[in-house]
């Protein structure tokens, strides 16, 4: 794995936690999962135990085991492994942070506590500071996802002076559609070399224009190769091609969102595309329906994200 001083950038897959039909974690497929990301999708950074990974539906012991398996199987294959250690309990977050440091993770990330919520920036920073202090040598990232936490403190406000209080702070995962807030995060911190990792996959191109240095998302598990084509087009200033790639990705995301799209459906799609059994989600989430999977498969094929050999009517809307 990379030096902890290396800036996290580029595509980062928000990993899925594979489970058996009985809801137990299926550790046996994580090695295959690593190889699939690297060899088939070209994605070499991962964000473990986050929203997509059902981290907050796992026990502390399970989260530690999942983190260990990713670090072990990703050794000499993945560039960076960031572990999400957020929890409602400060002590549990600190325990998870210490564990991440002990096993050789490349960084940690934390969401805001979302039951008894911090009511202003200073309270939230105090919480984050205590977690970061449990693993001071690890790069620390704030995971901003207000739609799920209900914590509406603007990221721009949070970043003001944060490195003075949290020396290991290195950036944030910004999972919100407020591009004004995101843009101001970048604009007001240009000299600080923070990692600005955007977390809304269907809006990534807009974030790149505003200065995103990378992206963390669930679709990079199975659309990583396509998204990398967009990044490469953007880097060579072929903005027309980059836009076409983004529109293509949006066609799929827009389609599945209308069907009902979340962690359960992500597991079903990843199973379909990779051939690696991701299993059902843990309660209270419900397994994706067969109808959803069939519709998603047809859409993936029509967009040329899967082999189209089974399509009788031809590939009418494939993205080049």
Swiss-Prot record:
Q: Which residues form the active site?
A: 143, 173
Q: Which reaction does it catalyse?
A: aceneuramate = aldehydo-N-acetyl-D-mannosamine + pyruvate
**Record: residues binding aceneuramate:** 51-52, 175, 199, 201-202, 218
Q: What is its EC number?
A: 4.1.3.3
Localisation per UniProt entry? Cytoplasm
Q: Which family does it belong to?
A: Belongs to the DapA family. NanA subfamily.
Q: What is this protein called?
A: N-acetylneuraminate lyase
Originating species? Bos taurus (Bovine)
């Amino acid at each position: 794995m990379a030096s902890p001083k290396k800036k996290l950038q580029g595509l980062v897959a928000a990993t899925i936690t594979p489970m058996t039909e009985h809801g137990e974690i299926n550790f046996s497929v994580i090695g295959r999962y690593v190889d699939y990301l690297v060899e088939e999708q070209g994605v070499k950074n991962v964000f473990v135990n986050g929203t997509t990974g059902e981290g907050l539906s796992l026990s502390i012991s399970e989260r530690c085991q999942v983190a260990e398996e990713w670090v072990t199987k990703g050794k000499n294959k993945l560039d960076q492994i960031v572990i999400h250690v957020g929890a409602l309990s400060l002590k549990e977050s600190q325990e998870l942070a210490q564990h991440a440091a002990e096993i050789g993770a490349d960084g940690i990330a934390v969401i805001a506590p979302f039951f008894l919520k911090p009511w202003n920036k200073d309270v939230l920073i105090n919480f984050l500071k205590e977690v970061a202090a449990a693993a001071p040598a690890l790069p620390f990232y704030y995971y901003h996802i207000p739609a799920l936490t209900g914590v509406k403190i603007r990221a721009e406000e949070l970043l003001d002076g944060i490195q003075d209080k949290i020396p290991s702070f290195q950036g944030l995962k910004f999972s919100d559609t407020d591009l004004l807030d995101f843009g101001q995060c970048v604009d007001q911190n240009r000299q600080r070399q923070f990692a600005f990792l955007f977390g809304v996959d269907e809006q990534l191109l807009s974030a790149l224009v505003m200065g995103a240095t990378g992206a963390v998302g669930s679709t990079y598990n199975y659309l990583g190769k396509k998204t990398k084509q967009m990044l490469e087009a953007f880097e060579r200033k072929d903005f027309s091609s980059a836009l076409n790639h983004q529109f293509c990705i949006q066609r799929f995301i827009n389609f599945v969102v209308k069907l009902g799209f979340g962690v359960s459906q992500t597991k079903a799609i990843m199973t379909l595309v990779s051939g690696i059994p991701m299993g059902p989600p843990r309660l209270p989430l419900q397994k994706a329906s067969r109808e959803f999977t069939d519709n998603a498969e047809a859409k993936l094929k029509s967009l040329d994200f899967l082999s189209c050999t089974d399509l009788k009517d031809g590939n009418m809307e494939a993205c080049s």
